[in-house]
Amino acid sequence: MKILVDENMPYARELFSRLGEVQAVPGRPLPRELLVGADALMVRSVTKVNANLLFGSSVKFVGSATAGTDHVDDTWLNANGIAFSAAPGCNAIAVVEYVFSSLLMLAERDGFQLRDKTVGIVGVGNVGRRLDTRLKAWGVKTLLCDPPRADRGDAGDFLSLETLVRDADILTLHTPLYLDGPYRTHHLVDATVLNAFADGRILINACRGPVVDNAALLEALQQGKKLSVILDVWEPEPGLSTDLLARVDIGTAHIAGYTLEGKARGTTQVFEAWSEFIGTPQQIALSSLLPEPDYAEVTLTAPVDEALLKRLVHLVYDVRRDDALLRHAAHQEGEFDRLRKHYQERREWSSLHVICADVESADCLNALGFNASVRGAR
């Protein structure tokens, strides 16, 4: 069997070569001629998978090592007998930690305590749910908005977007991109919503670029709107507005989910789905793939406060690195994709063992996602 894998999918060659002949291919653009004789195609979010790409091909299975699937026309795949599997939740932890790192950076810069803020989370799926849990573990009040879950009667105190815009100090977006229908999220944050924000609010988009009307956001900022903005995703990509980038507080190249652990989860999830599809199911232990982190252990001599938490978080990942890289490169054609293709290795907080001086700090850090223990207990 011939299996095409995105050249930037970690561990793909190593894993899929167990089950067939592997050929690494570019994700954007992916020339149709490379599909000749292929049985399976493994992609990332940069590849548009639809009739234009696959009509008349021999591909029987498509795997996307991503949580989102708006780049895949799964309706067409199903109608044409092509199996499809994605990797829901694979990068959720990475996105949560990106948001946390960004907020701690703004808190230090602007002189506030994150615990004193109310965070409105729009979209309570794999990312939003985990973010809610970690924020609460740090003592942050959260407000939740998720109309589909509210209408289904899911457990949770769900509020309207209007309520979050009114009452939350920070609004962070974690929805799928729906272009139409009752739960449309395309331009969910538009000029009307932006005008409703009180001065000093923080807006974060780390889901899909068009969930925020980028033109309306740029206009609002140009007109002096006092809004701190964190954008990891843009409208459009890769050709983002450099004028908008110049006005946001943190801007990155759609890399919020790009931890080594998140990428490895995505690859292993689609590998396991493919192995099931061909009748030779295999399970992969993530730990068997990952290397030792650059920083494996640190010892604390004081209880954890917000300043110390920021130092721990930024020891593992400091968002300012990626912000600086995008600002330096954004004016050059092709650099957005190059930053993603050659992304520097980044780990999750769980890769860092924190030896604490007290039980309360260890419990708190474990709840936040670190690997923590009390001195002498391990």
From Swiss-Prot:
SUPFAM superfamilies xrefs: Formate/glycerate dehydrogenase catalytic domain-like, NAD(P)-binding Rossmann-fold domains
Entry GO CC: cytosol
CDD domains assigned to the protein according to its UniProt record, in alphabetical order: ErythrP_dh
Chain sites annotated for binding substrate: 45, 66, 258
Pathway: Cofactor biosynthesis; pyridoxine 5'-phosphate biosynthesis; pyridoxine 5'-phosphate from D-erythrose 4-phosphate: step 2/5
Catalysis: reaction(s): 4-phospho-D-erythronate + NAD(+) = (R)-3-hydroxy-2-oxo-4-phosphooxybutanoate + NADH + H(+)
EC category: oxidoreductase
EC numbers, comma separated: 1.1.1.290
Compartments (UniProt record): Cytoplasm
Active-site residues, as the UniProt record annotates them: 208, 237, 254
GO terms of biological process kind: 'de novo' pyridoxal 5'-phosphate biosynthetic process; pyridoxine biosynthetic process
Main location as per UniProt: cytoplasm
InterPro entries: D-isomer_2_OHA_DH_cat_dom, D-isomer_DH_CS, D-isomer_DH_CS1, D-isomer_DH_NAD-bd, Erythronate-4-P_DHase, Erythronate-4-P_DHase_dimer, NAD(P)-bd_dom_sf, PdxB_dimer_sf
Pfam families: 2-Hacid_dh, 2-Hacid_dh_C, DUF3410
Binding-site residues, NAD(+): 146, 175, 232, 257
Molecular function terms, GO-annotated: 4-phosphoerythronate dehydrogenase activity; NAD binding; protein dimerization activity
Entry keyword set: Cytoplasm, NAD, Oxidoreductase, Pyridoxine biosynthesis
Subunit structure: Homodimer.
Protein function: Catalyzes the oxidation of erythronate-4-phosphate to 3-hydroxy-2-oxo-4-phosphonooxybutanoate.
Sequence similarity: Belongs to the D-isomer specific 2-hydroxyacid dehydrogenase family. PdxB subfamily.
Protein name: Erythronate-4-phosphate dehydrogenase
Organism of origin: Pectobacterium atrosepticum (strain SCRI 1043 / ATCC BAA-672)
